[in-house]
């Protein structure tokens, strides 16, 4: 793709927008970068891009920068139905996401991983598996560095692994991973999408341009994912905790079995550091992606036996008075909380925060079976109590610190206190990381 002298506009100057503008300028494009924030708010961004031939339009957008451009690159935070983008496409101008732009310049086999939950752990693990097996590997996308930083660096790599969000998939046209993985789909981001189906459709676009030469790694146990997978053009490679597979990877007592083209590999699970049923699925998905692209069993097993859980994903904090405390602040939707609840019994669950629009009803059975006490915080507390409060002993707390102390008082020896909110954090905290740190601090003060 030739970019030299092309009129390009980058909409939105968050992390991917900055990286895209830098790359386009390096390629010799005529770059306009535009953001609704003003110069003061973007001082750090402007210093990052200083010295590059970029024209900035700040505090507003000019329609002509879009409709008269050769190419518009949209940051994932910009809604797809933005009026300016509608006018741009009507004018016949190509609109792409940063991952679409990046993929046109990446020559290494690309592994792209999406799903409502587990993306970051699976992506990180896949990258570490490739590296342990001796492949020079770039890991980025929705975590760490934007995917466009790979071609921008000019560094040759043998494998690329990208975490991909539904937002990033909205503006693809030729994006084609060698291996695309869809881990699961549950209700999320209904504050962004007009319907659950629209969110599902966005996720499924990860497979859109694959052919029979590519692989689609999909969750056999997620009926929605599995049904959608039947119409894909790529070779299906499922993973499952519940089904034995003739082609795919599945768990059996004490081992994972990887079956591909008549060959079988057994991978013992006893030494895995990652715990929880959700992490077993993440491990299977990552292994599938990597074993399909040249990784070896022995080296991969060595890595799995030392790979630790990422922060804020069902992370053990400490044990006090024979009660274990786990922090799962990244669990901002019902699907991720369900996986956490499946991993424990005798739970005191701290949940709540800023409501994201989905139903909490899918948690009902697990709450009834496994949660002894439900401690609710934040804006969503009232609605969560309406949907789940009759299923177990339910309490409200004004602060997270109060919730931790209340949970300590309520939980019997042998039990588990789990922060797994099913909500975003923005009603009470800057982000999920601050919520996690406040929880950890409160637990350490017990």
From Swiss-Prot:
HAMAP family: MurD (MF_00639). It is an enzyme of class 6 (ligase). It catalyses: UDP-N-acetyl-alpha-D-muramoyl-L-alanine + D-glutamate + ATP = UDP-N-acetyl-alpha-D-muramoyl-L-alanyl-D-glutamate + ADP + phosphate + H(+). The keyword Metal-binding does not apply. One of its GO terms (biological process) is regulation of cell shape. It is found in: Cytoplasm. GO terms for cellular component: cytoplasm. One of its GO terms (molecular function) is UDP-N-acetylmuramoylalanine-D-glutamate ligase activity. Its EC number is 6.3.2.9. It comes from the Bacteria. Belongs to the MurCDEF family. Keywords: ATP-binding, Cell cycle, Cell division, Cell shape, Cell wall biogenesis/degradation, Cytoplasm, Ligase, Nucleotide-binding, Peptidoglycan synthesis. It comes from Trichlorobacter lovleyi (strain ATCC BAA-1151 / DSM 17278 / SZ) (Geobacter lovleyi). ATP binds at residues 115-121. Pathway: Cell wall biogenesis; peptidoglycan biosynthesis. This is UDP-N-acetylmuramoylalanine--D-glutamate ligase. Cell wall formation. Catalyzes the addition of glutamate to the nucleotide precursor UDP-N-acetylmuramoyl-L-alanine (UMA). The keyword Acyltransferase does not apply. Pfam families: Mur_ligase_C (PF02875), Mur_ligase_M (PF08245), MurD-like_N (PF21799).
